[in-house]
Design a protein with these regions (language model features):
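Hydrophobic anchor at the beta1->P-loop junction of P-loop NTPases
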Residues: 60
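Phosphate-binding/switch loop-helix module in NTP-utilizing enzymes
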Residues: 124-169, 175
Length: 232
């Protein structure tokens, strides 16, 4: 039976084009369920990149260890296999004796990397138990984002988290990348209330997907299909 709006007008059911499934109308909460992940609606037309659909901006969030970076790297692998130029920054943990001792920041295009967070370096900027080398973050990460915004087909940012937002130049580079007319993938700290993260979550032009231990192997393929315009 069709539902009716407050004005008495029947609301049509929505049909999933691929599977032929009928979805009943739901309250407009700004998110849709797609298998195991929630996806924010994308209402605006944007520029297309050859080999892809709309120039989507997708934020991947999740609990620590859920697989945000793993998911992002799998998407990058598939995009590059399709001949797309991916640029931006990636962070890598430094693990010694099964203990996380810090993080590298890496320019994905050039593979240049430096330690930017560590228990061992001296810095006035501390986040938790790590000292933050702002200059290393900016010389590698921020420059990578600027280059990707200008030259890459797809921009990647891993991650927008508590340590990275200590750099005003990083914050501005993320904003510039978000405003660029290019596809963008970024990983987001799940719980931080930093103003930049809050702004990203509120943006109408960013889809937020949550990775979990259950969907981490499937989600990269869904993201690529979203970026190619094969699913809505």
């Amino acid at each position: 039976m069709q539902k009716r709006s407050a004005a008495g007008v029947a609301e049509p059911h929505r049909t999933h084009a691929r599977h032929g499934l009928v979805r009943s109308p739901r309250p407009n909460l700004g998110f849709e369920r797609y298998d195991e992940c929630f996806i924010a609606r994308w209402p605006f037309p944007v520029r297309r990149v050859d080999g892809m659909g709309e120039a989507l901006k997708i934020g991947i969030t999740g609990l620590p260890g859920a697989g945000k970076t793993y998911c992002l790297l799998k998407v990058i692998e598939m995009l590059e296999a399709d001949g797309l130029k991916v640029g931006g920054m990636i962070t890598e943990p430094i693990v010694k004796r099964n203990r996380r001792e810090g993080f590298y920041v890496m320019d994905w295009a050039t593979k240049e990397k430096r330690v930017f967070a560590s228990r061992e370096i001296q810095s006035k900027t501390m986040v938790g138990r790590f000292s933050i080398d702002i200059s290393a973050l900016e010389e590698v990460g921020v420059n990578a984002l600027r280059s990707a915004t200008a030259n890459a087909d797809v921009i990647v940012i891993d991650e927008v988290g508590k340590m990275e937002v200590e750099s005003p130049n990083f914050v501005q580079s993320v904003k510039d990348a978000l405003d660029a007319d290019k596809p963008l993938l970024l990983t987001l700290h799940k719980k931080s209330r930093n103003p930049l993260l809050q702004d990203i979550r509120r943006r109408d032009d960013v889809r937020i997907l949550e990775v979990t231990m259950v969907n981490r192997n499937l989600l990269p393929y869904k993201i690529v299909k979203l970026m190619k315009g094969e699913v809505l």
